[in-house]
Amino acid sequence: KLHIPTISTKKSVELIRAAKAEGLKVSCSVAVHNLFFTDEVLEGFGSNYKTNPPIRTKEDVEALLDGLNDGTIDMITSDHNPLDIEHKKLEFDKATDGIIGLETAFGALNTMLPLELLIEKLTLSKAVFNIKNQPIAVGQVANLTLFDPSQSYEFTEKDVLSKSKNTPFIGKELKGKVYRVLVG
C-alpha cells in the first residue's frame, strides 16, 4: 500500500481518486493549513505561511475539501513542524518551511467539515497504518479529547503550547475549543 502525505492540489485529489477507483491500494493525507488558507495570504510574504507543500489556490482548497467529503483523502494531519525564531523571522525566500499545527487543528476546521467527519479524519483514520483504535471501556487505555465545538475564540500566542511559535493562526478567529487531551 502506498501512502502519499500532505497532498495540496486539485490534481493530486483527481489522481488519487482515479487510482482508488481502479482498485489501487493508496491512501493520503492533507495538512490543516492547506485546508484553512489560500494563496492570497502569501501576498504579504509572511514567513509563518511558508510551508512545504505550499499554500495553494482557492480551487485547490475546494478540491481538497471535496476529497475529504467523498473519502478520497483518508486523513487530516497537523503537519506540526516546530522551528525556532531564527529560522522563521527572515525574509520569505530565506525562511525555513514549516508551521506548527497541533493547537489549531480542531478549531481551524470545525466549521469547514461536519463534526463526525472531522473527528474521523483527525483520529480514526490512523487505521490506514494498521493502528487500532481502543474502545472506551473498563480496562482499556483511554485516549480522550474534551472539547466544546461551539466556542469561538481568537487564537493568541498564549494558546501556543509548543516552544516554537511559528504559526500563521495567531490572531485568527477559530471555533471549537479543545480543553484537555487525556491519554492513559
Can you annotate each of these PLM segments?
Residues 1, 48, 69, 75-76, ...:
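His/Asp/Glu-enriched, well-ordered alpha-helical/loop segment
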Residues 1-76:
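Histidine/acidic residue-rich metal-binding segments in metalloenzymes
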Residues 9, 33, 81-83, 151-152:
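Short, glycine-/Ser/Thr-/acidic-enriched flexible segments
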Residues 12-13, 36, 84-86, 145, ...:
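Glycine/Thr-rich phosphate-binding loops of Rossmann-like dinucleotide-binding domains
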Residues 16-17, 88-89, 158-159:
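Short amphipathic alpha-helical segments
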Residues 64-66, 135, 171:
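Short, flexible, glycine/charge-rich loop motifs used to bind or transfer phosphoryl groups or to couple energy/partner
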Residues 94, 141-184:
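C-terminal cap of metal-dependent C-N hydrolases
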